[in-house]
């Protein structure tokens, strides 16, 4: 015959029969403790950043010697309670919550330095990127190959899961939560059955991740046919469950937000909070009814995301004030429990969790889940884990490994687990595939090119190895369409071919003496081999065949006599080339540290249609970022030498990095129209950038240019020329890309100019 408590249990959760058996085991455990004294449960509600108040309560209870036999938690209460149950005391919990980088945790921040150069270029140019997988030649598994374009959450929660894995070493396998140093349970919400999921056994990391999956922010946890979201949607204050598990005395800490009036709901987060309140009100009221000591800090002026240092300090202080106010009730509890207090919860025979952030551990094997054998071999080589064997591993190594794998963009999420309850552990990487295909789009509006649009369509773009196909189109005054095929060997070498078409229809150029306009078509066939020894550097060698067709020349001078030695209406130029490139900037537009450099050499053979001399061209570009606080110094050096004035490979200046008509153009501040220069040029300059707030920037720029027609002339004051340019710019980092407005001057123009634009550079 079942008791009333058992009947309530059987009708409560998503799996009533399994829950009933587990709950009975918890009650049996409590019966053993009850032989000496009443049993005590600590119930911690959800409330985001306000969960710091839980730690103040825990520290007080520890100081007063109150035994805790069971911990129940929801959302952040589940996180704090889960760690406490695994052996972390209040002092350690406070150190953890104060030491966390919450921006990194909540938004899955990923450092740009782990991305390949090709991915850095892509991210720098495209505002919109939509992965997809809908083709039969897509190598994704059938169950994951047809992905919706809509995300089920902003953040995958990878960094949160990795934090749990680091803090819970020794409990990475399936575990019975009753066997933890303090028995524990937490609540999540199943979106399929609309019922709560009571976690009393299973993967502890998965349980903690699911109980705090805030709707709309974190993606749900999909487990055994369930789609689990934040437990606050069904039971944000699980005191009633604590009673069902056998607790005699319940100490409850309630940090939930009060119900909102219509005028108070001003954001999506407010709506989520109110919806959770409505859905979980019945269980909340039931929990209040069975609570013996109710602690409610005054935290209405804080939100779920108030994780800044000042807020955490205040929240913890408010928690201390709230538990101090309950001192009389807690003293009465001490009397009821008797003296001495028999603390049976922390069993000395049960090991506490290891904190990988403080202690390195031994592993003896590495396994990968979710990928094919070929991809496993590729990742082992990438991470230098070709051979198993006992070794010591640190948290820094694991974070580097995860970031490196995520940098391939082949996975939506990669997490790790340390399996086993003692050393040496098995290190398991869990890889969740991303769609391999991709569509990208970008647009820029500016005072030079007016409107420019960039489109990308990629097949197998995010494969670890094998071939990929990319179609890129730049639309506007200077249209360029390119079709590329790349084959990756998986060993740091790739082979590629490209066919491209470019139409330059806005080719207004100037020299120090003349103005002219040249419109042309440039079709190119290219093949290359690239060596990628590091993520931030590449060596590329190849051969290109250029077909040039000049469609229009407007000028009042004889260009072939006065300005360019060799310009044909139609010609074909074959050219081998080599490029070395490095990019370690932490941000493509507003870097504060890192170096960007490129060296390129081309040898243009004689024209195949019309005679032209063999021409050599070598170009060097270096830019670095030296940031300190809000101020960043960005020195730059450029140089280019071309042995003949062969159009379109002549030396040419660009007004900005965003407005390069030809690949070889060198940016020079202070001009409003592209300028041609003599065969040898060098320039040096620097930007000084001041950040105002989070997204506003003021930049002062100065640059010096030196040009000549030969090495000998370069050092001759009479035969070489010096130029100088200045600019003052305001920029705002918007969702569409940087908005820029600058005023500039140079002695080339001897007048002030204005540039205005919004969008990414491409």
Task: Give the predicted meaning of each segment.
Residues 192, 420-422, 626-630, 732-736, ...:
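A generic beta-sheet turn/junction motif
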Residues 689-723:
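C-terminal hydrophobic structural anchor segments
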Residues 1-74, 82-403, 407-419, 431-435:
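Patatin-like phospholipase
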Residues 438-443, 576-693, 700:
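C-terminal outer-membrane beta-barrel translocator/porin domains of Gram-negative envelope proteins
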Residues 389, 396, 716-719, 731:
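C-terminal soluble interaction/assembly domains
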